[in-house]
Amino acid sequence: MSLKEKTQSLFANAFGYPATHTIQAPGRVNLIGEHTDYNDGFVLPCAIDYQTVISCAPRDDHKVRVMAADYENQLDEFSLDAPIVAHENYQWANYVRGVVKHLQLRNNSFGGVDMVISGNVPQGAGLSSSASLEVAVGTVLQQLYHLPLDGAQIALNGQEAENQFVGCNCGIMDQLISALGKKDHALLIDCRSLGTKAVSMPKGVAVVIINSNFKRTLVGSEYNTRREQCETGARFFQQPALRDVTIEEFNAVAHELDPIVAKRVRHILTENARTVEAASALEQGDLKRMGELMAESHASMRDDFEITVPQIDTLVEIVKAVIGDKGGVRMTGGGFGGCIVALIPEELVPAVQQAVAEQYEAKTGIKETFYVCKPSQGAGQC
């Protein structure tokens, strides 16, 4: 049973009438451009064919009822006429409440809604299940009430909800790609202007995501430390963000910087340049160059930004040994565990899967999870 059929059936059973709309918003994987988003830089993600799906209908009052199919059909209910506050027990409900609350601040011309939510974006894998949920809820209200909001505004609203209501720091990339993703394309995003450019993906290439299943423990504290180090670097150059520093300017004075800060800055500057070049390589179908850029990105994250772990490095090495210069592989996401992403000719996927199955657990004691994805369409009706 598809997520659409599942949520429609649950909706009819729970609320006693049929849903009028079904909306989806996808998760994402970032192909290249790591930790560049909060430095006003470039990222190159694609939406994937794992998504949050919501069957829904407008109400003629100001009540919101939400059922979470993936959390034992827990039900949350709140009113648009009262101040929206955090739910005491259901963390999932706070993503919904946050999106609705921040949408009220942008455009208060919507009424109540009934929703049933389900999704298959793996949670805790760094594939943006939370952004997918935020964008899906925003799109529900936009579609049901014909709100004059575009995808970028729905994305910004989701980011605000996560930062201010849920209380989790995040850049804008995850929500933007979920809202604006394009089938068979990646999206080059300028995180300063929020300008986007669709980049066609070569035919016959699979997007493979492998979860190391190494439990991320340092990610929060270390993430904040990296942000502070980048801000220190930008201040040294008297610029608003590292986006505004050239590699030549950096090389001329790198010896004057704190050595750790210098390494962090070098990663951001080189990663930004790699990301822009990667978009061109992809568009030209140059998988060999894309693979080189992904390898350089991984080495930079490992040696300069220091956010990889041995388990992730092992996974990357296993995959690279199989694909050689026919594709690319690197860690993706915040670091300290999580996933790797690989661009692999479809005919090599079975060999990669076999090599990883034979070697990764033997070397690390952890079993991986393997996902083969397609670059998919952003949020909308399904």
UniProtKB/Swiss-Prot annotation:
Active site: 174 (proton acceptor)
Source organism of the structure: Escherichia coli O17:K52:H18 (strain UMN026 / ExPEC)
Subcellular location: Cytoplasm
Residues reported in the UniProt entry to bind Mg(2+): 130, 162
Catalytic activity: alpha-D-galactose + ATP = alpha-D-galactose 1-phosphate + ADP + H(+)
GO biological process, one term: galactose metabolic process
Chain residues that bind substrate: 34-37, 223
Main EC class the enzyme belongs to: transferase
EC number: 2.7.1.6
Similarity comment text for this entry: Belongs to the GHMP kinase family. GalK subfamily.
Domain of life: Bacteria
A GO cellular-component term linked to this record: cytosol
Matching PANTHER family: GALACTOKINASE-RELATED, MEVALONATE KINASE/GALACTOKINASE
NCBIfam families (alphabetical): gal_kin, PRK05101.1
Cystine connections: none
Chief site of localization: cytoplasm
Record's keyword terms, sorted: ATP-binding, Carbohydrate metabolism, Cytoplasm, Galactose metabolism, Kinase, Magnesium, Metal-binding, Nucleotide-binding, Transferase
Entry binding sites for ATP: 124-130
Protein name per Swiss-Prot or TrEMBL: Galactokinase
UniProt keyword Zinc, yes or no: no
Gene for this chain: galK
The protein's annotated pathway: Carbohydrate metabolism; galactose metabolism
